[in-house]
Amino acid sequence: MAVERTLSIIKPDAVAKNVIGEIVTRFEKAGLSVVAMKMVHLSDEKAGGFYAEHKERPFFKDLVGFMTSGPVVVQVLEGEDAVAKNRDLMGATNPKEAEAGTIRADFAETIDANAVHGSDSTESAAREVAYFFSDEEVCPRAS
């Protein structure tokens, strides 16, 4: 197993519910360290750029609208198999299909307002981390 980094976004619906701390606690209890974190209100341009791979999909406009509807918490998580571990903690994209005890099962309402985003691969993670954070903003903590 390798120490990896992954990007996590706590989406506007979860921020509005005041469950930021509960979500971060789950990451930490699972052995992931927060090595960078900031709260931002994404612009249409920033959200659209982040989700550019979906630009031609029918849900793109609604996705950008949702992601700009309120502040988000963007963070870099570091730890053994961080990408897979984060995805397991999040649960299925559709909260109705997410296993009990996952972040989405506990805090999400719909497939659109599904509480969190997580990188789907180490390659995506590297690209997504660089999109939101400079090297100087990431503080390694793994020993």
UniProtKB/Swiss-Prot annotation:
What GO terms fall under cellular component here?
A: cytoplasm
Domain of life from the UniProt record = Bacteria
Signal peptide limits: none
Q: Which UniProt keywords apply?
A: ATP-binding, Cytoplasm, Kinase, Magnesium, Metal-binding, Nucleotide metabolism, Nucleotide-binding, Phosphoprotein, Transferase
- SUPFAM superfamilies xref list: Nucleoside diphosphate kinase, NDK
Q: How does it assemble?
A: Homotetramer.
The name this protein carries in UniProt is Nucleoside diphosphate kinase
Q: Which organism is it from?
A: Alcanivorax borkumensis (strain ATCC 700651 / DSM 11573 / NCIMB 13689 / SK2)
Name of the coding gene: ndk
